[in-house]
Amino acid sequence: TDTIMPVISHWGNGWHGLDALTNIWNVILGLAVFFLARVLGALYFINNIDDKELTDKCRRAVLNNTVLFLLFFLAFVIRTLVSDGFAVNPDTQEVYMQPFKYFTNFIEMPVVLILFLIGVVLVLFGIGKTVLKKTFDKGIWFTGIGTVLTVLSLLLVAGYNNTAYYPSYTDLQSSLTLANSCSSEFTLKTMAYVSILVPFVLAYIFYAWRSIDRHKITEKEMDEGGHSY
């Protein structure tokens, strides 16, 4: 071990994390994210491209990819809610397996549960109205915001309420929790000051995307080439 840069962790086997690919539920989650990304991309095109033929194809793509997304997403969520979770004893910091831990987290954190349900409803509303109403092109706003809320709530369920967010399968007590993996007090204070800039960053992102998406892309614009903002 180097005294200047000591090794504070190591892989439990020679796979260096690649063995996560052998976990079918990791693959199922990855497929859910993949098809959701395709749905969001198609919704964005519908909102920003003025071409009936292309938007009609995008609407069909939304429907087809939504079916596959829901298949994998529901399977992952249901399995997560009924499986054992990696709980942390708040007094001893001991990590242990608790039945229905993530379902319990939802019950014990009702605000997170509400965020999750709102997110799911927004995702389904944006997709459903886009598919059923041919003139509706704002689905990306509902589905996009719903995706953010849903992902945020799942992350909170996986890491809050005395839960190990990065479990170790070779040594349960080496699992990462918010308590044993947070930065030093100095770093946390520094990042707290840096976070003051977040509203300005968000404002810039909003301004930039609003400028880009102010007018829908047309076939004529694509034929002319060049750049216009």
Question: Language-model features: where?
Answer:
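Substrate-recognition/cap regions that form aromatic- and gly/pro-loop-enriched pockets
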Residues: T135, V157-T163, S175, C182, ...
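Short, highly charged, low-complexity non-transmembrane loops/tails of multi-pass membrane proteins
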Residues: R214-Y229
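Hydrophobic alpha-helical transmembrane segments of integral membrane proteins
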Residues: V112, G119, G146, T190-A192
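Central hydrophobic cores of alpha-helical transmembrane segments
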Residues: I140-L149
